[in-house]
């Protein structure tokens, strides 16, 4: 009985050892199967950390590159340095680099503000010149005053040119003006020729026409008594005995030619002359030839 019990216990021990060995082998297999995952995880994390470090490094390097670009700006053009003048110009007309170069030529300090260097240069090289601003504000004020003076000079020159009377060329004595058809009737009539530019002459002519067109026509003008009339387009006096003379009308900034039918007018397309009539002749009349020319011009401009 003892032997049987001993053999059974030994068999149980052997089975227990085998079971424990199989469990250990299973655990080892599981550990071996799990080990690559555990190894891969640190690898991936290491890669991620490396990528993060590289991104950070690139971010750090970018400002450095930008700083390098900003530290090396484009080379500026060198300003030519003129020699020292006999009289120093105002401080607002001198460039800072030129002033600095002049100070360096005379071995003067060019530090500080531009006005300080200008004062040092004046005191050293131009002791007799005292008309210079003492502050930057005074320099700005002087600059603005100079601009105002230039503008005022330009305005005064324009006003003088406008108010100055135009040059008048009178015909030579003994030579009457060229007249058509009748010379006996037009003796003693003087024509005044004004030398002006074409646009000014046209404006002056239109101004005269508009001023005369507003005057009443009932009063008999002296030109009818003298037997001559002044044609606006021809710019000279012509015989008044021919039929077809018309008084120009001026409405809405346009000169109009009255037609034979009452109440109808046509626009004046002919340009007036730049000659001024004598004082006793009316300046808003159109001769029959010019009336006909204006009608032909209107017909040619009409659409077919």
UniProtKB/Swiss-Prot annotation:
Chief location of this protein?
nucleus
* One biological process term in Gene Ontology: system development
Phosphothreonine: residues carrying this PTM: 215
Where is the protein found, in the record's own terms?
Answer: Nucleus
Region Disordered: what ranges?
Answer: 1-84, 147-176
| Gene Ontology CC entries for this record | nucleoplasm; nucleus
Q: Does the keyword NAD apply?
A: no
The record's section on InterPro entries has: Dppa2/4, Dppa2/4_C_dom, Dppa2/4_central_dom
Q: Which UniProt keywords apply?
A: Developmental protein, Nucleus, Phosphoprotein, Transcription, Transcription regulation
* GO terms for MF: chromatin binding
Bias regions of kind Basic and acidic residues — which residues? 12-29
Does the record carry Calcium as a key word? no
Q: Which residues carry this modification: Phosphoserine?
A: 221, 226
Q: What does this protein do?
A: May be involved in the maintenance of active epigenetic status of target genes. May inhibit differentiation of embryonic cells into a primitive ectoderm lineage.
Q: How does it assemble?
A: Interacts with DPPA2. Interacts with PCGF1.
Question: What is the recorded name of this protein?
Answer: Developmental pluripotency-associated protein 4
Gene it is expressed from: DPPA4
